[in-house]
Curated annotation (Swiss-Prot):
This is Disulfide bond formation protein B 2. HAMAP family: DsbB. One of its GO terms (molecular function) is protein-disulfide reductase activity. Disulfide bonds join C41-C44, C100-C128. PANTHER family: DISULFIDE BOND FORMATION PROTEIN B. Residues 32-49, 88-142 are periplasmic. Keywords: Cell inner membrane, Cell membrane, Chaperone, Disulfide bond, Electron transport, Membrane, Oxidoreductase, Redox-active center, Transmembrane, Transmembrane helix, Transport.
Length: 168
C-alpha cells in the first residue's frame, strides 16, 4: 500500500493551527505596538515577516497537493530562521550599545514593498536595543523565540510522523 501524497487530516489540522498561531502572534505584536505605543525595531519587523511566511507556507500545505513535504520543510526552515533572529534580538537587548540612535537594518526593512503598503504593520519605528516591560516575565523577543521554537517542534514532529508513516 502506498503512502498518501498529500497531507493527512491530522496533519492538516496541525498545519492550520500553526498558521493561525503565527497570525495570532503577529496580531498580538500589533496590539502591543498600537495599544502600548511600543514601536517595532528592524528585528521585530523581520520576525513579523517570518511568522507571516510560516502562516503562508502552512496554509498552502494544509490545502493539500503534491508539494506538502516541501512546504513542511520550508515552514520548519523559516521557524528556525525566526528563532535565530529572536536569539540575536535577545542578545542585542542584553548587550545594549550597538546602535547610536540609528539601526543599520532600518533603511533596508523600510524599503521593502510591504512597508509602503502597510506602514503601521511593517514600518520600523524603534531600536532593537530598547527594552520594553516584560510580559509574564519574558521580553517580546523571548516570546518570539518561544513561538518560533514551538512551531519548529510541532513541524519537526509532523515531518517525523510523516516519515514513519511512509516507511511503514
Amino acid at each position: 500500500m502506498s503512502a498518501p501524497i498529500g497531507a493527512t487530516r491530522a496533519e492538516r489540522w496541525t498545519l492550520l493551527a500553526i498558521g493561525v498561531a503565527s497570525f495570532e502572534l503577529v496580531a498580538g505584536a500589533l496590539w502591543i505596538q498600537l495599544a502600548w505605543q511600543e514601536d517595532p525595531c528592524p528585528l521585530c519587523i523581520i520576525q513579523r515577516y517570518l511568522f507571516l511566511l510560516i502562516a503562508l507556507f502552512t496554509f498552502v500545505a494544509a490545502a493539500g497537493g503534491r508539494r506538502v513535504a516541501l512546504l513542511r520543510v520550508l515552514s520548519l526552515t523559516t521557524a528556525l530562521a525566526g528563532a535565530a533572529v529572536a536569539v540575536r534580538h535577545i542578545y542585542v537587548q542584553a548587550h545594549p550599545g550597538f546602535s547610536c540612535g540609528f539601526d543599520a537594518l532600518q533603511p533596508v526593512i523600510d524599503s521593502l514593498p510591504p512597508a509602503h503598503w502597510l506602514p503601521p504593520v511593517f514600518k520600523v519605528g524603534g531600536l532593537c536595543e530598547t527594552l520594553y516591560p516584560p510580559i509574564l516575565g519574558l521580553s517580546l523577543p523571548m516570546w518570539a523565540l518561544v513561538g518560533f521554537s514551538a512551531i519548529a517542534v510541532a513541524l519537526g514532529w509532523r515531518i517525523r510522523a510523516q516519515a514513519v508513516i511512509r516507511t511503514a
